[in-house]
């Protein structure tokens, strides 16, 4: 996980714990900005997944031509990175859903 992603999770968790206070508009703006940052990170992860899947397809296509020359190390690395991206994307989506629900609840209460 990058420092940027760690910082994003810290911001999200702080917003989930923090009381909106008297300045609900300011708080909601921070929530919305953080949601936007989170969605942008999710898009980056999706793009990375697509890139990894394409590379895996290229490598497995080559296996049909010459199975003895299989790039097993690269396939293993790609599989691990793909699994990591899937896990992070799932975690991020869940965390963003909680933040989105919080924003909705604050808007409804206003």
What does each of the following model-derived ranges do?
Residues 1-10:
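Eukaryotic long, low-complexity intrinsically disordered regulatory regions enriched in serine/proline
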Residues 9-36, 66, 107-110:
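Short, charge-rich amphipathic alpha-helices with coiled-coil/heptad character
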Residues 16, 23, 30-33, 37, ...:
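Residue preference for a single heptad-register face of alpha-helical coiled-coils
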Residues 49-75:
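Extended alpha-helical coiled-coil "stalk/arm" regions
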Residues 61, 89-110:
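Long amphipathic alpha-helical coiled-coil segments
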């Amino acid at each position: 996980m990058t420092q940027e992603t760690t910082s994003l999770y810290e911001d999200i968790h702080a917003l989930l714990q923090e009381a909106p206070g008297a300045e609900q508009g300011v708080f909601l703006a921070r929530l919305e900005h953080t949601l936007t940052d989170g969605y942008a990170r999710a898009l980056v992860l999706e793009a990375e997944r697509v890139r990894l899947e394409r590379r895996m397809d290229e490598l497995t296509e080559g296996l049909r031509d010459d199975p003895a020359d299989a790039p097993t190390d690269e396939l293993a690395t790609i599989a691990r990175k793909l699994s990591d991206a899937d896990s992070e994307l799932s975690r991020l989506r869940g965390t963003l859903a909680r933040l989105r629900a919080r924003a909705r609840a604050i808007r409804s209460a206003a």
